[in-house]
Amino acid sequence: MHGYIGHTDYGWWRYLSARPGIHEVNFWRPGGRRFAALSPGEPFFFRLNSPINRIGGFGLFARYASLPVWRAWEVFGPANGVDDERALLERLGRLARRQVGPGDLVGCVAVSECVLFEADEWVNVPATFRPQNLSGAVIDLRIGDGHRLWGECLERAAAVPRFEWVAEASDRLRRGQPQMVMPRLGQGSFRLRCSMPTPAPVR
């Protein structure tokens, strides 16, 4: 079993951590870059960018699609980590260093069953992880620092009542048998599954 450590913008994390009712998020990728690092149910860890460089939470990978920005906003809304479509376009434009329009593609990584930790619960990034990796990196959760990371994240998630699956996942980890958990699909993942890229509407 593997997980993925994704470089996470602190503003995105702060926005979503202030909204505990959002359980599924869009970890978007500028330019529609494909994401094929995980299978559904494997953990996606949110590594807060430098100077923080710690794990601020995690969720379970649900699915990926490349969509026009306007459609990504329709599908996920505030789960994109911003208040409105204009703010999403501005955030994407800053990262891409160019103007981004509603019809431009954005990669949508749907992450379900999310828990974002308080600052005093942040988890240390594995020593083998190299922040200079462009977008993130896969880590083996069966051994070493990956095993430690998954265990510490499960400990923190155990305090969240809606995570019924945590007890079984923790037990399997203690027995040296980490196992994927099939994520409960939220509205975003359901809409993502039904989405086909279409031209941007006339505005």
Language-model region placement:
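Compositionally biased, charged N-terminal/linker segments
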Residues: 1-40, 48-52, 115-116, 121-133, ...
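Short, well-ordered loop/turn elements at secondary-structure boundaries
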Residues: 39-41, 104-105, 197-199
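Short cysteine-rich loop/turn motifs with clustered Cys
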Residues: 188-203
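Aromatic- and Lys/Arg-enriched surface recognition patch
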Residues: 55, 60-135
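Short, well-structured hydrophobic secondary-structure segments
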Residues: 38-66
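N-terminal short leaders/motifs
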Residues: 1-10, 57-68, 192
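Short, surface-exposed loop/turn motifs that are enriched in glycine and acidic residues
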Residues: 177-184, 188-192
